[in-house]
């Protein structure tokens, strides 16, 4: 524990908590603080200019990161007939209907994303108490309830991330791994921010992207100077 505490203290000493760093310097600092033995994820937190308590200002959606997430995901799909075959061809790990629902009810949740064709929601809807708390419930707002299940599978496998604002008005997302080149991380961050701007509620007033910070799994958050993102 002492070693961990010393490492955390050393990392904090590298960063001025109130300073906003150019994106290149911010990523360099984050990577230098990512000293765990595994390939830490690089995460971003975006403070939005919205009132998360208002239902018409809940920001939610998904985006396919151009450089991927660095993580392989298992995808389950509720579909039948031609759509089921298309999902399998696209790379789905598990495809089914009532049989898949029974697996879920039995606690067999060996997947990271659940996709459903609209005509299967009569089955999927009964699984809300199981899938919902785990963040697995399909939703059209993030593209996981769709007639084109094959494309949804491809998106998931290609590095799609889902985002939803929390009660504090902050979006949390992973944009890659420590092993990623900075250009890949910046490309992913840009794609995420573009998606957030597109998802801006019509009732949101004032500055929308208020603060952006990047960090690693075990590291300290580093604030990003937004003007450097367009450089």
Swiss-Prot record:
Among the GO biological process terms of this entry, one is: translation
Q: Which InterPro entries match?
A: Ribosom_uL1_bac-type, Ribosomal_uL1, Ribosomal_uL1-like, Ribosomal_uL1/biogenesis, Ribosomal_uL1_3-a/b-sand, Ribosomal_uL1_CS
Q: Which UniProt keywords apply?
A: Repressor, Ribonucleoprotein, Ribosomal protein, RNA-binding, rRNA-binding, Translation regulation, tRNA-binding
Going by the entry's taxonomy, the superkingdom of the source organism is recorded as Bacteria
The molecular function terms in GO held by this entry are:
rRNA binding; structural constituent of ribosome; tRNA binding
GO CC term (a single one): cytosolic large ribosomal subunit
What SUPFAM superfamilies does the database record attribute to this sequence? Answer: Ribosomal protein L1
- Similarity annotation: Belongs to the universal ribosomal protein uL1 family.
Could you give the subunit structure recorded for this chain? Part of the 50S ribosomal subunit.
Q: What does this protein do?
A: Binds directly to 23S rRNA. The L1 stalk is quite mobile in the ribosome, and is involved in E site tRNA release. Protein L1 is also a translational repressor protein, it controls the translation of the L11 operon by binding to its mRNA.
Entry's HAMAP family?
Ribosomal_uL1_B
What is the name attached to this protein's record? Large ribosomal subunit protein uL1
Species annotation: Cupriavidus metallidurans (strain ATCC 43123 / DSM 2839 / NBRC 102507 / CH34) (Ralstonia metallidurans)
